[in-house]
Amino acid sequence: MSFSPQEALQRTIEHREIFFDEMVDLMRQIMRGDVSPMMTAAILTGLRVKKETIDEIAAAATVMREFALAVPVADSTHLVDIVGTGGDGSHTFNISTCAMFVAAAAGARVAKHGNRSVSSKSGSADAVEALGAAIELQPAQVAAAIEQTGIGFMFAPIHHPSMKVVAPVRREMGVRTIFNILGPLTNPASAPSVLMGVFHPDLVGIQARVLRELGTERAMVVWGRDNMDEISLGAGTLVGELRDGKVREYEIHPEDFGIAMSASRNLRVDGPEQSIAMLRAVLDNTPGPALDIVALNAGAALYVAGVASDIGDGLARARAAIANGSARQRLQQYVDTTRTLVA
């Protein structure tokens, strides 16, 4: 007998956990459209108020992966996702998108999962499209792009068609729900390593442990103390690192890597055009905090991808890829390849 939505709602009201198998059953019902919009909204609200557990998040992510259109990557060596939950309210330029090109040029292979803007001035999909790349690639085309360029951008609506069922509910609710933290956990290419930014410090340890439950090999989950969902230059950054099946939590600072502190307001943009201008300036090796934060985050991605021995080594590799022009070339190669794939 399936786990009833009414029982799920009752559990959340009483601040009791929904167990893994029950949550899998419930999420399948929701994703199939078997649960009414009103009941779905009530359950999502109850989970948020109660605070979602590691098992509840892992179970929900497992089902979203089940329903996703997977990208058939033949070789996942050094394959990493660089992703953020968004919702940090910082309105910075597309740091993780820029880091994607840098990390790929420095030896990683990046399968980045993203969407258009919801809370930011420019979502990752908006940025990749504004750079001239085709974003609406089918799974086999994404796999081909990864094979040819070391980069694959996966536009979330294409890979998660079942999300159409809950989209109207989420839109009408207008508040964060479990789905805001599920997106970064449901990479359609099943990248074995991930650099993930989160919007709340509590999620640093939680998401690292959820990734472990989901079988991720290496991960860094980060939250900047200035409320950035990236490794920050403006404050310390809390890290939950998953390695060898263990989660270690610690804090890093830009000075640890010889980088001057810089407030996040120096990285703010008013829209996609400004974001793209800042991204291109970084790839043109223009010195400043924008280049520093991209190199640091790309360096961390190179570390979790197994390309670099530590973040410092990754940072040096990232800076070299920017300085020698290979990151800029990789961007152009990706743009040209995606256009050819959809032609």
UniProtKB/Swiss-Prot annotation:
Pathway: Amino-acid biosynthesis; L-tryptophan biosynthesis; L-tryptophan from chorismate: step 2/5. It catalyses: N-(5-phospho-beta-D-ribosyl)anthranilate + diphosphate = 5-phospho-alpha-D-ribose 1-diphosphate + anthranilate. It holds the Pfam family Glycos_trans_3N. Gene3D superfamilies: Nucleoside phosphorylase/phosphoribosyltransferase catalytic domain (3.40.1030.10), Transferase, Pyrimidine Nucleoside Phosphorylase, Chain C (1.20.970.10). Anthranilate 2 binds at R170. GO terms for cellular component: cytosol. One of its GO terms (molecular function) is anthranilate phosphoribosyltransferase activity. Signal peptide: none annotated. It comes from the Bacteria. GO terms for biological process: L-tryptophan biosynthetic process. 5-phospho-alpha-D-ribose 1-diphosphate binds at residues 84, 87-88, 92, 94-97, 112-120, 124. Homodimer. This is Anthranilate phosphoribosyltransferase. The lineage of its organism: Bacteria, Pseudomonadati, Pseudomonadota, Gammaproteobacteria, Lysobacterales.
